[in-house]
């Protein structure tokens, strides 16, 4: 072919537009939501030379083969666990069903694959220092098995401290398993993992599928943060492993985040969630430990593990159920506020029912496009009667929901489409007034350090900023 021919450029543009039409049709047939399909199809049709490559990286939602493979792996894992008598939860599950507060969340028993269980102990861990002090102290006491899973692990001061601790426990004969997300931890050097492997730690990356093409996929990430030590103590929440989570990022410091420490029968659910992800990555089961006995009292907890391979959109349905069940208040904190139409409508309806609806979001951006889209949704929420606050001291990264007087949820799920439909997430639902009071006290402290967004803020926003926000919202279904 004569690349200098005057027709070559025209042929090339024609081919790109043809590929754009094919990709647009692909998006229409495969993207789960109408908003997402439109957000992809229109630019693919009109400006494919700008959107084809981003669609290959961020879109390509026909992951039916991937979803089928993930479900098959989960099935194989549970078959392998069948002989372990892994769910001796009858008494704890029956006790949980008697709770009136949990009964108000009528969809939860069927929404989660794991039951609500009684007789757990929970402890609120506010910010990075308290969280990692508790995690490191628990690992120090490990005797048998340590399970560690994070979306992000950095090879910095905190990451190296975790590495050395895990190496020391492995040298003592403890079985150590580490799982991290390949995209979230893209900056983690291979030498970090190799040092752990050489020291006897089993470490693997969570990837979507094998193959050259899929290495460019950034969807279907594993956003979960789980640590379980000897089946006796566990941790989940919003922190990853990096110095910024200790407030050492100058532009985002102080970092505001929340974790929860857990003991009791619900730890079996955390281990089961880890086992599913580990089995997907390795086709092997990690050791799973149940204590000989549980305490006779404690709080009700339910682990809500969600992901794109679920038969239904577990994460978004949880937010809907939590908001619809509220009779007095629903407070939500999230670093990203990009609700879909159903969740946004639920928030508006809650306001009309007289519920105290509050949303706490950051005042500083870590992703500018997401921040712009969040800002527009915040302005619209304020006009609908939702009280929206911006946390002032530093970057807010916690993911917390408080419903009425008894129900709270802390985990890894953000209030955005990525958590709703693309990421693997885990949230701990707790039904207990005393713990909810602690969460309320924590959030009240946050609100005192926040500035409430007003209708005037929207009117005072420059038109160019408003235009940027609206463009960001157009692509919000694919953010």
Swiss-Prot record:
Gene Ontology annotations of biological process type: cardiolipin biosynthetic process
GO molecular function: cardiolipin synthase activity
Membrane topology: Multi-pass membrane protein
Transmembrane segments: 8-28, 38-58
Cellular compartments annotated: Cell inner membrane
InterPro entries registered for this protein in UniProt: Cardiolipin_synthase, CL_synthase_A, PLD-like_dom, PLipase_D/transphosphatidylase
Positions annotated as active site in the UniProt record: 223, 225, 230, 397, 399, 404
Protein's recorded name: Cardiolipin synthase A
Organism placement in taxonomy: Bacteria, Pseudomonadati, Pseudomonadota, Gammaproteobacteria, Pseudomonadales
